[in-house]
Amino acid sequence: MTTAAPHDIIRVRGARQNNLRGLDVDIPKRRITVFTGVSGSGKSSLVFGTIAAESQRLINETYSAFVQQFMASPARPDVESLEGLSATIVVDQERMGSNGRSTVGTATDAYTMLRILFSRIGDPHAGTSGAFSFNLPEGMCPRCEGTGRVSSIDLDALIDRSKSLEGGALDAIPNFVVGGWYWKGLAESGLYPADVPIAEFTAEQMDAFLHRPATRMAIAGMTMTYEGLLVKVTRLYLAKEAAQPHIRAFADRVATFAVCPECGGGRLTRAALGSRIAGRNIAECSAMQATDLAGWLRGMQAPSVAPIVETLLGTLDALVQVGLGYLSLDRESGTLSGGEAQRVKMVRHLGSSLTDVTYVFDEPTAGLHPHDVSRMIELLRRLRDKGNTVLVVEHKPEIIEIADHVIDLGPRAGARGGELQFEGTVAGLRASDTLTGRHLGHRVSLKESVRRRAGAVEIRGAATHNLRSIDVDVPLGVLTVVTGVAGSGKSSLLHGSLAGRPGVVVADQSPIRGSRRSNPATYSGVLDAIRAAFAKANGVKPALFSANSAGACPVCKGAGMIFTELGPAATVSSVCEECEGKRFTAEVLEYRLRGKNIHEVLSMPIVDAAEFFAAGAAHTVLARLVDVGLGYLTLGQPLNTLSGGERQRLKLAINMASSGSVYLLDEPMTGLHLADVDTLLGLLDRLVDSGNSVVVIEHHRAVMAHADWVIDVGPGAGHDGGTVVFEGTPAGLAGSGTLTGRALAEYVR
C-alpha cells in the first residue's frame, strides 16, 4: 500500500480482542477493504469487536452522563491504540426482532412516505399521516390494536370436557393441577359443580367458567378475585412473552391466530382503509411486492406529491437493487432471514447524505444467488464512491476480487488464528501462499457419476406463498440441492411441504431458544458427560460442576456476569468480581481432571476438547462438532453470540447420530471459508452414505456441482417465480440455460 497521510488511514496497533495476537494493521479510508480468513480466525473480533465497538464507545462518550445511562455502551476493546476512526455504521445479519409491528416498510421508512402520500391525496381524506399508522392509536384498528390478527384459544387443547374439575379436566394447563391455588379459585367458586364433567355444564355455567371478567367474591372462606378460565389463562400465559420453555410450549399449543374480522388484516381503522388512491388503499399497496408497487407509483400523475413519490421510488428501487424486489412493505421484519435483514438495513443507508463514515458489513452476499451478487458489488462501490470507508467480512471470491485492500487473518481458527497472514492487493493475495490465497481460484468439476435414488417424497399442489401448485418428487437416498434466486420459492417449497413430515430433520439458521447461559456444551448434551468425568475423578457429585446448580457462584448465580437493569435502557453487564467471570465457586475450581478445572475445560476450543476427551460419549459428540466446522468455538461460548450459519451447523451436529432420516439444510455454506467447503461436502456425503437423504437449499455453486439431483425454482422472485424450471443432474443444469444453470456453467472447470 502506498504511503498515505495519517488522516487517510485507520491505524490499529496491538489488537488483542478475543483471539487476536497483538495485531497491527493499517486500513485505508474511502476504500473497500475485505477481511478474509477461515471462520473463527479473528475477522469479526477485529472489525466488529475492535474497530466498530471503539467507534461506538467514543461516540457515546460525547453525550451527557444523563443520556449515557439510557444507552448500551460497549466496553473498551483490548487494543493498545486506534487512530483515524470515523463514525461507524454496522450493517450485520442480526435479525430485526420478532415484534409484529416492525415491517419492511417501517424499517426502511417506505411506509412513512406511503402514509404521507395517502394523507395528502387519499380520497376521501382520512386525516394526517398518523391516521394511517397501525402503531399509533389514531390509526390502529381498535379490535386487533394494529396487529391485523386476533388471538383465540383452542378449548379442546386447553381442557378435557369429558372430565370434571375434580377429575383433572385442567391438568393440561401449567399450575392448574387438582388441589392447586389456581384450581381452587375455579373449583371452589360455587358458580358451577366441580364433580360434573364440563361437557354437562349449562350455558350459564359455561359462560361463568370460561368468560366471567375479574370479580371480587368469597371463595373457600376468603375474599379473592375470580376470573373465568380463558380470562385467567390469557392474562397469565398469553398476554406477554413467556420466559420458561414449558410455558412457551403451552402457549404455542393452545393459542390460535386468525385474521382480524374488523380490519381484514389491514391493521388500520375503517376510515384509513376507506381512503384510496387510484382504487387502492394503503393496506393493498403495502401488500404489493416492491417491484409492482414501484410500477404503480410510476404511473401516478400527481404533481403535488411528486417529491414524495420520488423519495418512495428511491427506496423501492434500492430494495430491488439489493435483490429484495419480491418483498412487500407489510412483510414482518422478524420473518426475514439474516441475509435479507442485512440488505433491508442497507437500503436505509443508500439514500443517506452522510459521507466519510465507515460502513461495516458481515457477509453481505449471504442468501444471494450468484446472479444477484453483481448488484451487491455495485452497491458497495456506490457507498465507497460517496467518500465512505467500506469494511467487509466476506468469503466469496466475487467480493474479495473487488477489494481495494485485503487483510487476511489466520492461519486457522480460535487459538490457532488471530495473526496477520497477508495485507495488500487482491493480486498479491492470489500470489501469496496463504490458505485464502491458495483457494481464491477454487473451482470444482461437475459430478461424473451420481447416486441412484431409493424412492422419493412426493410433493403435490404446493401453493405456499408464491408457489404455483408445484408437483415435484424429492428423491431419497441422495444429495438433492434446491436452487433459485432469492425469493423464488425454495424455502416455501421445502419448509412448507417437506418440513414437519415424519423422519425429516430440519437444521436451519433460526435462533436457538435458550437463556444467556446456554452454550455448545449444554445444547449438545456433552456437558453431562464432562460433569460425570469430573465427578468420577474427584469422588463428588456431578451437580457441583454445573453453573446452574450446586457449583454456581453465589453472587452471579453461575452467569459469570452481573446484569443491571436500567429501566428503559439496555441491560448493562459487568464481570462478576467474586468468581472473576468463571461462573463456579472457588471450591469447585479446585477439582481437577487431568490437570484442568471445569472452567478451563469449558474455555477450550471444541477441537482441543475433542483431543482432551479422546474417547467415550464426550468425544463422539465433540468430533461431530469438529466435523461440521465448529472446532474453533469454545465449549462455553454463549449461543446468542453465534451466527446463523454456526447455529445451523450446531443443529446438524446434534442430529447426525440418527440414520434413515431426511436432513433439510438451509444454506449450510453460510460463513464457511473456501478451504472448508470441501470438508462440509465430505460431511454431506457421509450422511448420505450412512443411509440418510440430504436436501439442501444452497446458492454456493460448489454444492450444486456436487449434488446427485438438482431442483431449480424460478425463473425469478416473488410472483415471477414459484415454478420448477429444472429437475435433473448438475451436468444437465449447467446446460439448461436457466439463471442458475448459466451461473453454474461459468463456475465449473
Give the ranges of each region predicted by the language model.
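Conserved phosphate-binding elements of NTP-dependent enzyme cores
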Residues: 1-749
